[in-house]
């Protein structure tokens, strides 16, 4: 908190404020965390602004309409455990979330977190399956284009399935034309297809 005050308009201060907001999120103080994150969305550091926006959206999209935060509390706990590299414990909590709240808007976020953990564990087949679940569950999800892009990257770089990667990049370009991943997907698609790039 002191760094946040001493370096209020500096990247270091913004990083400190983000870490504080993330800590509030981990503790379950979602409204306060979101208020802090909303301030950071206009941060000068693009990385901090993107991280703040991402976490703020996660909170706002998944706060219950009746203001219950039980599912979000579970997810935040799993997120904290993953942050602390206690991935097996995080997976247990994410499984609990799927069992207790099978129709909650956090289901796809939980699968995405599980996919990230599977990537760290180098279990690429399970990671691919989880991205597939996200896309089958809700192709209009806020994270659907992220899942599709990560799945394409996975096939290109780790599963060495260039044909599948090509198909997935094309799907992203066609189905999510407004995605931030379109430009990079188009480049990767052309490179995999063998086009001469400038």
Predicted regions and their residues:
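Acidic, polar-rich low-complexity tracts and alpha-helical solenoid repeat scaffolds
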Residues: 1-198
């Amino acid at each position: 908190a002191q760094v946040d005050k001493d370096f209020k308009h500096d990247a270091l201060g913004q990083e400190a404020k983000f870490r504080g907001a993330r800590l509030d999120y981990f503790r379950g103080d979602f409204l306060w965390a979101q208020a802090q994150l909303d301030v950071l969305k206009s941060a000068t550091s693009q990385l901090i602004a993107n991280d703040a926006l991402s976490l703020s959206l996660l909170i706002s999209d998944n706060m219950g309409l009746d203001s219950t935060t039980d599912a979000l509390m579970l997810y935040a706990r799993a997120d904290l455990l993953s942050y602390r590299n206690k991935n097996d414990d995080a997976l247990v909590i994410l499984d609990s979330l799927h069992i207790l709240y099978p129709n909650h808007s956090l289901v796809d976020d939980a699968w995405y977190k599980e996919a990230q953990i599977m990537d760290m564990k180098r279990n690429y087949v399970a990671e691919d399956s989880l991205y597939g679940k996200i896309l089958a569950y809700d192709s209009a999800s806020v994270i659907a284009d992220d899942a599709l892009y990560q799945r394409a990257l996975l096939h290109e770089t780790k599963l060495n399935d260039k044909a599948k990667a090509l198909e997935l990049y094309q799907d992203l370009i066609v189905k999510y034309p407004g995605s931030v991943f379109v430009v990079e997907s188009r480049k990767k698609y052309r490179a995999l297809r063998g086009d001469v790039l400038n």
